UniProtKB/Swiss-Prot annotation:
Record carries keyword Cytoplasm: yes
Similarity annotation: Belongs to the RuvB family.
UniProtKB keywords: ATP-binding, Cytoplasm, DNA damage, DNA recombination, DNA repair, DNA-binding, Hydrolase, Nucleotide-binding
Biased composition range(s): Polar residues: 1-10
Gene assigned in the entry: ruvB
Residue numbers spanned by region Disordered: 1-41
This protein's name: Holliday junction branch migration complex subunit RuvB
Protein origin, superkingdom: Bacteria
Annotated spans, Small ATPAse domain (RuvB-S): 198-269
Compartment list: Cytoplasm
GO molecular function: ATP binding; ATP hydrolysis activity; four-way junction DNA binding; four-way junction helicase activity
Disulfide bonds: none
Length: 348
């Protein structure tokens, strides 16, 4: 689904999505520290249960003088998995080496990563569910026995050579924990899910980011941004940046109120529930052309001109979470709450 802030059918250049929790190019520049990330567990807002579990594990590892057990972090994008890995490295006082599974296509890629690991280092692999089978099999003995098994030579001259590895911690991050193979998943000592953030935590995050960006937000402005970000800090920070852009153009960086936030969100076609034009188009399609459903995914995707996988994995989760859409064996159905929201938007 095209979650974009530009008008449908417009000839203007397509803008970057503001309500997609995937990182934008400006947020994926390769710099692990953009100045907004917390550095210690005490500074990390929200995810209290996760912080408690990992805090105990960190203290125990430091007390033993050993590496932290391997950690798997899973959950929707934009909730702070990479940030938590960096925080763990800071708490442990070790180096964090960051990579992603798509960058480890060949065996030599992951071998090079493992042979250069230092004692107690933290190795972070994002999108770990996308590792290929060969890379996974190289990780098995490395994670369990701190050993790297290499095959040298070919055919009848091939022989296996084992290299001892220093103690290290692998932190894997994924949005699809079910896509990990059981042998890989079972080798993680700590498996933790990150949850969507509540309004109070999001307001604290927006307020903190505003301070770091040097902008002044009223309480109402902070509350409005936090209420439109789909429970996701990455989206909250992105919306704040777009609000800051409008404030900068109008010369109002030091007086951002709720009215200015509403103006900026309206520019990007984001409503008070955090739905954008693409979300409302899907709901309107069901309401106006299919009498609320049920409608099959393929039919709905064809009517909207979208890819079925995009609808299912990117668009629908938030609508389902908000109680605006229902999946049934016969297809997608609109809820009364969705109808009420569409009518409300028509009046507005």
């Amino acid at each position: 689904m095209a979650i974009v802030s530009s008008n449908a059918g417009s000839s203007a250049p397509r803008r970057e999505p503001v309500l997609d929790a995937q990182p934008l190019p400006e947020e994926s520049s390769g710099r692990p520290d953009d100045g907004l990330r917390p550095k210690r567990l005490d500074d990390y807002i929200g995810q209290d249960e996760l912080k408690q579990v990992l805090g105990i594990a960190v203290q125990a590892a430091l007390g033993r003088g050993d590496a932290l057990d391997h950690v798997l972090l899973y959950g929707p994008p934009g909730l702070g998995k990479t940030t938590m890995a960096l925080v763990l490295a800071e708490e442990l006082g070790v180096t964090c080496r960051i990579t992603s599974a798509p960058a480890l296509e060949r065996p030599r890629d992951i071998v090079g990563l493992l042979v250069n690991v230092q004692p107690r280092d933290l190795l972070f692999i994002d999108e770990i569910h996308r590792l290929n089978r060969v890379s996974e099999e190289l990780l098995y003995p490395a994670m369990e026995d701190r050993r790297l098994d290499l095959t040298v030579g070919k055919g009848s001259t091939a022989r296996t050579r084992s290299l001892e590895l220093p103690p290290f911690t692998l932190v894997g991050a994924t949005t699809k924990a079910g896509s990990l193979s059981s042998p890989l998943r079972d080798r993680f000592g700590l498996i933790q899910r990150l949850e969507f953030y509540g309004q109070e935590d999001l307001e604290a995050i927006v307020s903190r980011t505003a301070d770091l960006l040097g902008v002044s937000l009223s309480a109402g402005a902070c509350r409005r941004i936090a209420g439109c970000c789909r429970g996701t800090p990455r989206i909250a920070n992105r919306l704040l940046r777009r609000v800051r852009d409008v404030a900068c153009v109008q010369g109002r960086q030091n007086q951002i109120d709720e009215g200015l936030v509403s103006q900026a969100l309206s520019l990007h076609r984001v409503d008070h529930r955090g739905l954008d034009a693409g979300d409302r188009r899907l709901l309107a399609q069901l309401d106006q052309h299919h009498d609320g459903g049920p409608v099959g995914l393929e039919t709905l995707a064809a009517a909207l001109g979208e890819d079925p996988t995009t609808l299912e994995s990117v668009v629908e989760p938030f609508l389902l979470q908000q109680g605006l859409l229902v999946r049934t064996p016969r297809g997608r159905m609109l809820t009364e709450a969705a109808r009420a929201h569409l009518r409300e938007q028509e009046v507005a």
